[in-house]
Swiss-Prot record:
Family of the protein in this entry: Belongs to the UPF0398 family.
Organism: Streptococcus thermophilus (strain ATCC BAA-250 / LMG 18311)
Positions in coiled-coil regions: none
Descriptive protein name: UPF0398 protein stu0232
InterPro entries assigned to the protein according to its UniProt record, in alphabetical order: YspA
Residue intervals passing through the bilayer: none
Superkingdom of origin organism: Bacteria
Gene3D superfamilies recorded: 3.40.50.450
Alphabetical list of Pfam families matching this protein: YpsA
């Protein structure tokens, strides 16, 4: 079993506020290219944390790829209450994260910021590698997770960058 943790920018961090935004198609094209490569290299589990934006788009692509690959999907939410205050449209996306092969949460509810660090460490300790859409120059809260991955020297990290998206766009 080879697992791939998938996470990255949230939609609002990319200036994407509608599902039909043209940027989404470019991002999904890059995701599909990369996920196929991971699958061809033996990845058979893709792990999500239930975030909107990059993770949701990757989930959509992964569900499509399940038709052609022996792929299993999991969502590990940080909290049982994750997404409970989302809009109705986003509740549908949350439901998609729950309609996978394996679903668990780490904590019943948020109590302290330390839970995020514990959750991130759990993800690193229990997955084989990460696929991350993040650039340190465009800093968000992902910086904490990114820095933990970098500190874990034996944990492979594959990044999708804005340069990669420009390449996909020019193809």
């Amino acid at each position: 079993m080879t697992s791939l943790l998938i996470t990255g920018y949230k939609s609002f961090e990319l200036g994407v506020f509608k599902d039909k935004d043209p940027k989404v198609n470019i991002i999904k094209k890059a995701i599909k290219r990369d996920l196929k490569r991971f699958l061809d290299e033996g990845v058979d589990w893709m792990i999500f944390t239930g975030n909107l934006g990059f993770e949701f788009w990757a989930l959509e692509v992964a569900k499509e790829l399940q038709k052609d690959y022996p792929l299993r999907l999991a969502t590990l939410f940080p909290f049982k209450t994750h997404g409970q205050n989302w809009s109705e449209a986003n509740q549908e996306k949350l439901a998609a994260f729950k309609q996978v092969d394996f679903v668990k949460y780490s904590f019943p509810a948020y109590q302290s910021p330390a839970q995020f660090k514990q959750f991130n460490q759990f993800l690193i300790d229990n997955t084989d590698q990460a696929y991350l859409f993040y650039e340190p120059e465009n800093e968000t809260n992902l910086k904490y997770f990114y820095n933990m991955i970098i500190a874990a020297s034996d944990y492979p990290l594959f990044r999708l960058t804005f340069d990669d998206l420009n390449e996909v766009m020019s193809e």
